[in-house]
């Protein structure tokens, strides 16, 4: 079919001709929902009417701060699509089943109506946020049945192959993607992770992070690992993981089968957990249909939207945000670099 032919032609082209557009010299790729939830959880800001606007304001301020910090040539924000967890829940039904929003610092906010009020506020704010973002010179992506992680991975490793990419997220899943062209900025820690910093903090280089994490599991997504084996224990058993070469899950299991230690025997016994977690946690080869990949390519390669200042000002006045962003015109100037 023509769509598949177009996709394979594109794949061949990107392998031999990585992107050279000046626009794509340094792309800031934002994990949208991760950034929003962090802002919603910790930012207690209220507008003039006393409504909680922490998610909206916190997100906008965070994006502006990060653009000012890195001076990217463009910005792409990716949100989880509808039914985004569905494919992974087919593999493991408990995936993200217990994920909840934690309003750690929202002491000024009256959630007396219980979780329902909080969820309603969150939905209203994220919907409004998209209206703001559509007025900024930013590319926004959200695709049904896909998590932002998978789309971000495809953008950074394929669509923008050859470009410098800064991923903005507090999600450790992205450690595995870091290389000479891709870095990870954690807005919670205000730290930018390159290969060496991940080696220093996590104990292994990025290419072996996935091997460690599929054994350790991921509590934030409700993915259990092999009980009793953490990263430090695994690295002690297999020191090769600390070296600057790829040691994947398949090699781990082959090596474990050759040893008679308790740790290796536990790994062999729980092989199914390791293989399942690999499917759930790997981002290098995201499960995206060819037609959907073309949608991502078209969105990233399209012209960057123009700044629509008058529409932004209208939203700003309607939402009564002058107490949170006092000098709106000055605040907007940072987006002019995009």
Give a label for each model feature:
Residues 84, 304-314:
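Multi-pass alpha-helical transmembrane bundle typical of ion/small-solute transporters
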Residues 303-304, 327:
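C-terminal accessory extensions appended to soluble enzyme cores
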Residues 2-10, 14, 18-165, 174-192, ...:
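Noncatalytic, basic helical substrate-engagement surface that gates or grips nucleic-acid strands
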Residues 208, 216-290, 312-313, 318-331:
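Accessory alpha-helical DNA-binding modules that contact the DNA backbone or grooves
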Residues 192-220:
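A short, charged helix-loop
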Residues 1-13, 317, 326-330, 337:
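Non-catalytic terminal extensions that flank enzyme cores
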């Amino acid at each position: 079919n023509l769509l598949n032919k177009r996709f394979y032609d594109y794949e061949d082209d990107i392998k031999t001709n990585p992107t050279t557009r000046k626009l794509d010299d340094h792309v800031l790729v934002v994990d949208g929902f991760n950034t929003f939830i962090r802002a919603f959880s910790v930012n207690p800001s209220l507008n003039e009417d006393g409504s909680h606007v922490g998610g909206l304001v916190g997100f906008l301020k965070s994006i502006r701060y990060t653009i000012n910090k890195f001076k990217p040539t463009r910005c792409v924000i990716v949100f989880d699509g509808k039914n985004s967890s569905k494919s992974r829940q087919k593999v493991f039904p408990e995936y993200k089943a217990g994920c909840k929003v934690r309003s750690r610092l929202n002491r000024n906010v009256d959630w007396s109506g219980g979780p329902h009020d909080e969820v309603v506020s969150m939905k209203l704010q994220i919907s409004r946020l998209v209206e703001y973002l559509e007025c900024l010179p930013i590319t926004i992506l959200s695709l049904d049945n896909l998590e932002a992680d998978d789309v971000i991975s495809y953008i950074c490793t394929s669509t923008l192959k050859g470009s410098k990419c800064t991923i903005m997220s507090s999600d450790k899943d992205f450690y595995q993607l870091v290389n000479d062209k891709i870095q990870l900025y954690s807005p919670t820690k205000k730290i930018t992770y390159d290969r060496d910093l991940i080696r220093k903090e996590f104990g292994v280089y990025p290419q072996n992070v996935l091997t460690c994490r599929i054994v350790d599991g991921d509590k934030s997504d409700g993915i259990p690992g092999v009980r009793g084996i953490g990263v430090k224990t695994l690295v002690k058993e297999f020191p090769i993981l600390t070296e600057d070469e790829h040691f994947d899950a398949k090699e781990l299991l082959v090596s474990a089968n050759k040893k008679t230690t308790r740790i290796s025997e536990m790994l062999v016994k729980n092989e199914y957990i390791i293989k399942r977690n690999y499917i759930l946690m790997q981002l290098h080869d995201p499960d995206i249909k060819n037609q959907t990949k073309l949608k991502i390519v078209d969105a990233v390669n399209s012209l960057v939207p123009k700044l629509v200042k008058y529409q932004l000002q209208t939203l700003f006045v309607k939402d009564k945000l002058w107490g949170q962003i006092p000098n709106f015109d000055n605040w907007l100037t940072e987006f002019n670099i995009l």
